[in-house]
Amino acid sequence: MRDALEKKIAESEAAFPKILENLPDRLGYRAEDGTDYYGRVIMAGGEVLVDKVRQRVLYPILEGLQKKYDGRVHIIIQTTGDLVTDEILDELLARNVWLVSVAGMDDYHVGHEGEKRLPVMDRLHALFHSRGMVQMNEYEPVRLSAQTAHTWYNMFGATEDAWIGKLWPRGRAWLNGLTTATLDDNFCNAWSGGLSFLNHGEAGSEVSIEPDGKVYPCCLKTAAPLGDLTQEKLIDMLDALRAEPALQAINSGDPAAMGENYGWSREHFIERASAKMPNGIVCNNLCLGCDAFFGDVLGPVLEKSARVRLDRSA
């Protein structure tokens, strides 16, 4: 485990300067009323506050974002909260962090089951308030207004009434048979899904960037990447892929349509959107159809497209 962590950290250290270089010169979006807002960078996945990750990867990235955008970007740290101390919070705020988002406030995280999470939440509330931070859920209209001087925090978890309550068919939720997602749960057509990922410069456009620079249209991550941010600029990548019908289907939140130009009917996509979890229970979800289509068809198409783009720029 220690060797795997060191390998991932070294990979991130090598990749992040190029990733920062290939991000857009301006990160922002325009709302429906025509108002321009800062864009957001969410640092999440695993636990970004682990000492080695925080010191060797997270802090240099935060400092690089500050240098590139001069504060004109909203930086969000997502953490389970266990490692948020007075010292670490001060270090984050000093590096222009705008929101600390505490995930894992649910029964799936050890030590947070039921009322066990209440003391954890009380400690975090007190810590955040001591730094003048405002709980985002309490002042949602302020969050959407012009840039404010506030720093924010929120807490959430995979509870039944939450948007992630069904659990994505990924990771431990898949390995442990915890996902209850069905074909009615379209993760693509939602926040953190592929919806509007191609529409850069507009509200809701979002991509997922791995530590090695691989880019995906959603947080769940498709079975193959769109491209590599250590090798090309993000906007160039998205613009080059804009005409791909399968990606347009993801962009519109309609993944079952992604194979229609490749001989995959909606009916066939639904047939392939089924797999048996390690515990023997069959899961039926659109993400599984997406995995199958990427594996059989779209993965090689995207790989070829990336090679062509890189050859042209060589």
Predicted regions and their residues:
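Conserved glycine-rich "GG(E/T)P / GGGxP" loop and the immediately following alpha-helix
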Residues: M1-T159
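A C-terminal junction/extension of Radical SAM enzymes
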Residues: A126-K221, G259-M277
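Flexible mid-to-C-terminal extensions adjoining Fe-S/redox cofactors in radical SAM and related proteins
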Residues: L220-A314
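Extended, compositionally biased low-complexity polar/Lys-Gly-rich tracts
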Residues: Y38-G45, V50, E206, I281-F293
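Flexible loop/turn segments at secondary-structure boundaries
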Residues: V50, T85, Y216, A224-P225
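Conserved, mostly hydrophobic/aromatic
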Residues: I77, G213, L234
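Extended amphipathic secondary-structure runs
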Residues: Y38-V41, E63-Y69, N199, S205-D212, ...
